[in-house]
Every structure is written in structure tokens, then in C-alpha cells.
């Protein structure tokens, strides 16, 4: 913003709350304005646009000054002498005024105006919240700024948002009076989807505020935002239909609902939704994963096994979206029909179906005539793999067993309206698919493989045109169609690294354009009780009628090793360095897995007895059976007492197993410890004095690929983990060729269950599919304790128990919080 001189703004100048919990700083504590500049997410509001004089013949104050006692009460920092030790460098005032004239235009307090922008750029938008003259007779006004969408984290995706829509900020600073350009008309409207019908003629309108901490778009608290001078000022801000802003009474009523429904997209084996439901349960909210969608059939089998109450769909999400739209049409046609169906209608349909079943039992096929008995399922896609995508029903034919069931296109069932109506009515009643407004919460991590650093052909210029990134668009389109109350998107940090954070900005822009509040943060798995450093991005969304959830602060002391883009490093969920907090000691590999029984490279048992006792609190609680855990229903399939699932490793081939047996059982051991390898300045080379060693198969003990990996500078090939370590991440492939995966004391890679422990899966969570598929499910999962912590803050938001702060302290640690009865107090060693 235009200024005569460069100086620091005082705490009084900028009213962004400066809670130590809001920012993690690697340097000494700084004030909120300096933090904003360090984040560099916005064009600087403090830069001088072009030379302006503080006093001008075309700018002057009008009328008598505000009485001294009134002015000193409202702006005390302007009338106190600066202490040399104080950070307060605010300008001092001789008089305050209510009106000023600039270039013949009369301005009043609380008027809105354009303020001179930088050369060649648009003028800034602000509310005049203060007018004063300094002891040196310089004329200033204080601006409270509005952001255009492109001034926020959305940046280049500002086109997603209405050009007339702006966002209020808490940022204020002083500017020379003659920087005012002209008055503008800004209206405040209710933050709802019908806003376009309610917008009166204006230059701009706003319904949310934007704060730099955690890049937050949120509702405006009208009571706290109202100026005491606004009634006198003749302000040109109009508040329109304010009753549309959320009301606490509605929120309290909603929190008494028996359950909240969750749709898990890109669900994998269900780790994210499982954790969210755990956390919500701890907060006092019953969250149920009603629907889940994933393209991997083995992951779907795992989720269904552990969550029999969930409708699990194994299909692409774009087909799922098409199905949702078709399902809504069918429900309109057969159920709603312009009005809600009565219970008697639904019961009549059920009775008709039962009658048809009874009649079918008396019939037997006497010819090859196929008659539809009932419809079993519905999908959109190409189930017959005949390149004819569309809407299909699975048909059970009258007089035939299930082996004759087939998928039939809707066009071929035009004579089966009764069967179709029965299916739709029952499906509607059972909510086999969500209709708009029925999914309270949508979570998911749309794969964005086009941003991966392993992808050499990334499209940096147009990331959304890359087929590998299109799932982000599909995810947002599903949200747009279903209109859930809450949204949580998870993704890799690369979405903020790649192409200037293009995809992350797009995601925020889509949510805001759909009238969702939004907030972005990064969380490290190790900070919530796991021995791994993995960092992930989480984006919250909440309708204007709901409270925007916060992020849970860490419970364990772990320093992340992830490379975070400088522009986004301040959204890391963490305590500030100067904040006194009591964090538990980081969990290491030993504390997580050393109670598990030894297994061999070729072990193939999918379940076995523990044969051991837990040695740490983590091990004690991670072994809990379903009946002992929060949020698990009685119909969940319970593991037999004392049985351990999935504790088997990927079987290495003969050559790799022989190599692993040669790796010393010591900290830091890897292929560099093998005979014939020299290391000079962290780069490997062959030892010319040693003859190359060969395996029984005739292949070399030290493979060439190990010597050339990362140009000979990597120590990862055939690396052995150690008990006191924390792993960088849990991988999807258990091959030891370029990863540190070997067990500290056994000649094998970590087992599926050991990897699952590192991701926080309870031992009772059984996985399905081939061994490699189970490793993939675990590696792709969201760490369960991270999801649990987020579920807890979601529950607080639903209950109306959280404030506007982006961060919340957790009153528990993982995994002791899983216990249905907390008779044993966690001593902090977990």
C-alpha cells in the first residue's frame, strides 16, 4: 500500500490476533505483520506505490477534531509516548477527524475507497477506519484492507471467483491522506449459495474474511466487526440479509443428531475415514462411513471387511459422479416425484418385493425365456467391458440362480418399470447412494501423480490438463454436486511445490467459489505418536452454516525432515519455538514393533499368535480388540483373542535374500558394508584390491544398480533400519533395492503388519489381497492418528466447542485414546 516512508507496523496497526500457537518460527518471535511478509503469499501491502505527499493542497480534514477524550479512548496508542524498549513504532496523533476531502470528494470514517496501487496495477480496496493529523501536521488515514481473490492464496485461479467478490481482512496500516482515489460501494451479504439473487447494485460485495495464518477463508463475526463510529459515519457498507449467517442455535440442534454420514473418496483400505470416525467419537459425535469409493478392488475388500456397515464401491470416481447424477434423476422420478414419499409408500414397495420373492419360489424355468425378477445393484460405466459405457442395473432373472445374474443397460429395461421402481424406492430408503445434502462430510485424497518428483514428464504450464491430475477436478465436482457440510482433502506436499502450488491454489479456489470456508495446513505423522516423518497437506472446507474446524496441535516431539516450499512453510501445524509446551518423546521403531514375534523371509501365514507381551503403552493399545475400542459397532468382524494379522514380509528372491544375509546387523548398515565397496567423500567406488564377490547364482553380491543409484551417493540400497530410528516414510513397495527397509535384527524387509504399525493401524485391522497389494494399501494410507486428531477437531466444530483459532490442543495421545475405557492413564511413554 502507498506510504511515505518504510517502517514497521505496530501491534495496534494490525489487529491480526498474534497467538503464539498460530505460527511456527525458526527465528525469534515476530509480529503478525512481519510474519505475513515472511510467508510471501500476498503482494506486499506495505510497499510504496508511487510518491505521495503527506500533505497536499487537494487533501484536507473537514470539520472539528474528534473530542480528545473520545479519540484517546478509541486510539490510545496514538497518544502515548513510544518507549525505546517497546515494539510500538506507530505514528502519533495530534488530532483525529471524522471527515476529510481529497480531490473534491468527501470521505467519512467507515467509508470504502480505492487507494492508489502500484504503478500499472489495480488500486487497492479499503475501509477508512481512522483519520488523524500527526504532531508534525502530517495527514494520514488508516486503511483496513480487502483482498481480491488473486491477492490471496488462490492467486492465478482468481477467475474461479466472482470479480466483484472480495474478502475482508484484519490487516490495517497508515497511509498518506492523498492516496485516496475515490469512494466505492461495498455491500456485505450472507454467505450462502443463493447470494447472486441477493446482491444489490454495488462495486464489490463480501461475505467472508481472509486471514494469512493457515490461509483461512471464514465467516465474519458481525458483532465483533462492527465499529462504534459506524452509526455516525454514514458508512457506505450495507449488510444484506445477515440472518443468513450461521446461528449457534441451529448448530446446537444439529449436534444432537444420532449420527453424521461420511463419504470416503479414494478411500484405499479406509485408514483416513477410520481415523476420522475414531476422533469424532472421542469428541462425542457419531460419525459413520456410509459410503466409500476406490478403484483398487483389494483396498475395497479390506475396507468392507473392517467396515461391513459401509456401502463400498469399486469404481473410478468419475463414474461414481455420473452415477450420483443418474441416481438423483431416478429418485426424482420414482420416489420424490415433486413431493416427499410417505413411509406407507416405501412399506408398500417392500411388501410388493416380498410378494414377488414368494411367487418366484413357486416358479421354475420351463423355457429359455428370461424375465426380470428384481434388480440387485446399479452402476455407471462399462461393467460388461464391451465399450458401451452408461447406466447399468444388475439383474436377477426369474427362475435362475445368481450365476445367471447380468449387468443390463437401462435402455434394455424399459418394460421393467415396476422392478426399477422397487429398486429405487428401497435404495432411497436405505441410502445406498448419497443424494445432494445427504453426505454430511466428504473426505479423500485425490491422486495427483502428475506433480510427483518421479514423473519426468510433468506439465508445469498447465497441470490440470495432465490426465494424472484430473482427479482433483473430479473430487471438487463431487463436492459441488453433493454439497456436504464439511470437506477434508488430503494430499502430498508436492501439490504445493509443483508449479508454484498451482494445484493447491486451485483446490482452495474451487472451495471458496462453491461458498465453502477453507483452511490449509500441513501435518507430520510423527507429531501424533508414530515413528515416521511423513508430511501431508490437509485442506478443510465448511459451509457457511457450520463452524470451520481447526488443526490439532502436535502431541509428540518430532522434527519433520520434509522439504517444505518457503512460500507455504508457515502453514505447518506446530507450536512456535518460543512457546512452552509439554510434548511427549518421539516414538521410535523399537517402541512401535519390538513386541512382534520373529518371522522369516519365506513365512506365509496371514494370521498367527503373538506369543509375546506388549512392552510399551503404544504396543499395549495398538493390540486392542474391536470390542475394546471406541466407535466400533457390534457387527464389526472381531479378531480372535491373541491373533495377529498380516505379520508376514514380502518374500525376497534368492539373490536378494542372500545379499540381505550379508548386511551387518548394526545401525546404519547397507550395501556399502559389503566386500569390495569403497566410500570416498560419500561416493562409492569399487575396491581395486578386492576381487568381485559373486552369489551362488553367479550374480554379483553388490549389484551395479546399487553402485550407480543417485550417482553413487545414496546409502539406501539394502539399508538396515535400527531400533532408535524414525523412518522417513512408509513406502508402497517393499523392495530393498533403493530403500532402507530391512529389519534391524532379522534378514528380511519389514512385514506388512510392522509397516501398518508405523501408519498407526490397530492390529485388529485386517488387510486383503496379495502381499504386494497389502503393502501398497498401507503405504498409500493416511496415518490413522493424524486422521483421528482431525476427526476430533471436526467433532468440536460440530458441537460448537471450537473458536476461530486455526489450532487446537489435543487432550489425549495416540493410541491410548482408542480404548473404550481409559482406566489406565497414559504415562507419556507412548
Predicted regions and their residues:
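Epigenetic mark-reader domains in eukaryotic nuclear proteins
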Residues: 31, 36-105, 136-251, 346-349, ...
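PEST-like, low-complexity acidic/proline-rich intrinsically disordered segments
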Residues: 1-17
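Conserved proline-anchored active-site loop of SAM-dependent methyltransferases
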Residues: 262-276, 397-399, 435-457, 486-492, ...
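Class I S-adenosyl-L-methionine
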Residues: 323-359, 374, 378-390, 431-439, ...
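SAM cofactor-binding core of SAM-dependent methyltransferases
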Residues: 263-324
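Short beta-strand-centered aromatic/proline hotspots
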Residues: 110-111, 121-134, 141-144, 373-377
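Eukaryotic short linear interaction motifs
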Residues: 2, 116, 121-124, 133-140, ...
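C-terminal target-recognition/interaction regions appended to catalytic cores
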Residues: 260, 404, 598-830
Amino acid at each position: 500500500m502507498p506510504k511515505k516512508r518504510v517502517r514497521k507496523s505496530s501491534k495496534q496497526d494490525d489487529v491480526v490476533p498474534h497467538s503464539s500457537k498460530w505460527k511456527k518460527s525458526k527465528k525469534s518471535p515476530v509480529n503478525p505483520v512481519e510474519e505475513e511478509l515472511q510467508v510471501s503469499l500476498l503482494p506486499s501491502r506495505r510497499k510504496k506505490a508511487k510518491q505521495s505527499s503527506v500533505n497536499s493542497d487537494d487533501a484536507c480534514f473537514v470539520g472539528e477534531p474528534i473530542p480528545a477524550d473520545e479519540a484517546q479512548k478509541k486510539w490510545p496508542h496514538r497518544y502515548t509516548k513510544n518507549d525505546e524498549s517497546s515494539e510500538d513504532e506507530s505514528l502519533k496523533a495530534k488530532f483525529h477527524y471524522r471527515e476529510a476531502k481529497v480531490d473534491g470528494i468527501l470521505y467519512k470514517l467507515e467509508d470504502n475507497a480505492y487507494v492508489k496501487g502500484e504503478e500499472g496495477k489495480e488500486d487497492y480496496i479499503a475501509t477508512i477506519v481512522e483519520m488523524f493529523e500527526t504532531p508534525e501536521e502530517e495527514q494520514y488515514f488508516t486503511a483496513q484492507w480487502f483482498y481480491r481473490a488473486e491477492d490471496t492464496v488462490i492467486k492465478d485461479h482468481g477467475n474461479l471467483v466472482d470479480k466483484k467478490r472480495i474478502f475482508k481482512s484484519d490487516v490495517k496500516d497508515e497511509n498518506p491522506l492523498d492516496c485516496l482515489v475515490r469512494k466505492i460501494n461495498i455491500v456485505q451479504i450472507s454467505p450462502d449459495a443463493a447470494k447472486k439473487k441477493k446482491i444489490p447494485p454495488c462495486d464489490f460485495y463480501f461475505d467472508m474474511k481472509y486471514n494469512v495464518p493457515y490461509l483461512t477463508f471464514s465467516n465474519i463475526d458481525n458483532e465483533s466487526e462492527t465499529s462504534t463510529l459506524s452509526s455516525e459515519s454514514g458508512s457506505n457498507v450495507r449488510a444484506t440479509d445477515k440472518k443468513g449467517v450461521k446461528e449457534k442455535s441451529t448448530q446446537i440442534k444439529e449436534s444432537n443428531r444420532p449420527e453424521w454420514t461420511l463419504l470416503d473418496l479414494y478411500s484405499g483400505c479406509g485408514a483416513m475415514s477410520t481415523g476420522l470416525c475414531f476422533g469424532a467419537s472421542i469428541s462425542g459425535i457419531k460419525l459413520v462411513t456410509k459410503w466409500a469409493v476406490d478403484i483398487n478392488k483389494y483396498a475395497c475388500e479390506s475396507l468392507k471387511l473392517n467396515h461391513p456397515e459401509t456401502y463400498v464401491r469399486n469404481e473410478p470416481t468419475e463414474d461414481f459422479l455420473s452415477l450420483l447424477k443418474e441416481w438423483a434423476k431416478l429418485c426424482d422420478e420414482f420416489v420424490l416425484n415433486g413431493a416427499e414419499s410417505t413411509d406407507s409408500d416405501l412399506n408398500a414397495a417392500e411388501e410388493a418385493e416380498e410378494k414377488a420373492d414368494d411367487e418366484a419360489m413357486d416358479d421354475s424355468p420351463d423355457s429359455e425365456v428370461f424375465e426380470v425378477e428384481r434388480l440387485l445393484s446399479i452402476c455407471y460405466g462399462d461393467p460388461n467391458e464391451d465399450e458401451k459405457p452408461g447406466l447399468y442395473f444388475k439383474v436377477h432373472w426369474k427362475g435362475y440362480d445368481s450365476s445367471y445374474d447380468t449387468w443390463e443397460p437401462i435402455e434394455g429395461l424399459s418394460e421393467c418399470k415396476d422392478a426399477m421402481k422397487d429398486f429405487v424406492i428401497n435404495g432411497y430408503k436405505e441410502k445406498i447412494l448419497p443424494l445432494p445434502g445427504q453426505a454430511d462430510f466428504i473426505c479423500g485424497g485425490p491422486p495427483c501423480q502428475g506433480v510427483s518428483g518421479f514423473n519426468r514428464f510433468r506439465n508445469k504450464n498447465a497441470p490440470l490438463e495432465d490426465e494424472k491430475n484430473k482427479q482433483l477436478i473430479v473430487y471438487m465436482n463431487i463436492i459441488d454436486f453433493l454439497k456436504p457440510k464439511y470437506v477434508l482433502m488430503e494430499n502430498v506436499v508436492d501439490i504445493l511445490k509443483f508449479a508454484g502450488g498451482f494445484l493447491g491454489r486451485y483446490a482452495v479456489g474451487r472451495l471458496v467459489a462453491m461458498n465453502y470456508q477453507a483452511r490449509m495446513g500441513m501435518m507430520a505423522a510423527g507429531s501424533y505418536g508414530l515413528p515416521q516423518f511423513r508430511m501431508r497437506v490437509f485442506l478443510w472446507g465448511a459451509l457457511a452454516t457450520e463452524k470451520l474446524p481447526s488443526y490439532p496441535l502436535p502431541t509428540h516431539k518430532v522434527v519433520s525432515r520434509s522439504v517444505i516450499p518457503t512460500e507455504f512453510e508457515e502453514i505447518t501445524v506446530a507450536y512456535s519455538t518460543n512457546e512452552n509446551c509439554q510434548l511427549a518423546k518421539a516414538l521410535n521403531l523399537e517402541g512401535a514393533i519390538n513386541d512382534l514375534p520373529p518371522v522369516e523371509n519365506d513365512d506365509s501365514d496371514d494370521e498367527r499368535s503373538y506369543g509375546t507381551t506388549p512392552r510399551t503403552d503404544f504396543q499395549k493399545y495398538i493390540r486392542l480388540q474391536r470390542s475394546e475400542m471406541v466407535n466400533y459397532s457390534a457387527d464389526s468382524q472381531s479378531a480372535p483373542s491373541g491373533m495377529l494379522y498380516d505379520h508376514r514380509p514380502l518374500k525376497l528372491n534368492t539373490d536378494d535374500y542372500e545379499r540381505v544375509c550379508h548386511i551387518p546387523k548394526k545401525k546404519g548398515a547397507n550395501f556399502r558394508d559389503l566386500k569390495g565397496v569403497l566410500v570416498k567423500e560419500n561416493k562409492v567406488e569399487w575396491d581395486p584390491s578386492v576381487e568381485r564377490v559373486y552369489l551362488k547364482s553367479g550374480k554379483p553380491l553388490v549389484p551395479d544398480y546399487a553402485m550407480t543409484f543417485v550417482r553413487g551417493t545414496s546409502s539406501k540400497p539394502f539399508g538396515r533400519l535400527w531400533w532408535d530410528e524414525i523412518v522417513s516414510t512408509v513406502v508402497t513397495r517393499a523392495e530393498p533395492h533403493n530403500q532402507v527397509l530391512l529389519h534391524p535384527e532379522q534378514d528380511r524387509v519389514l512385514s506388512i503388519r510392522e509397516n501398518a504399525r508405523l501408519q498407526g493401524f490397530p492390529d485388529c485391522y485386517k488387510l486383503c489381497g496379495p502381499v504386494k497389494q497389502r503393502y501398497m494399501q498401507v503405504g498409500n494410507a493416511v496415518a490413522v492418528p493424524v486422521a483421528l486428531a482431525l476427526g476430533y477437531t471436526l467433532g468440536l466444530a460440530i458441537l460448537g466447542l471450537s473458536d476461530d483459532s486455526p489450532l487446537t490442543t489435543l487432550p489425549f495421545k495416540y493410541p491410548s485414546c482408542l480404548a473404550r475405557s481409559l482406566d489406565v492413564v497414559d504415562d507419556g511413554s507412548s
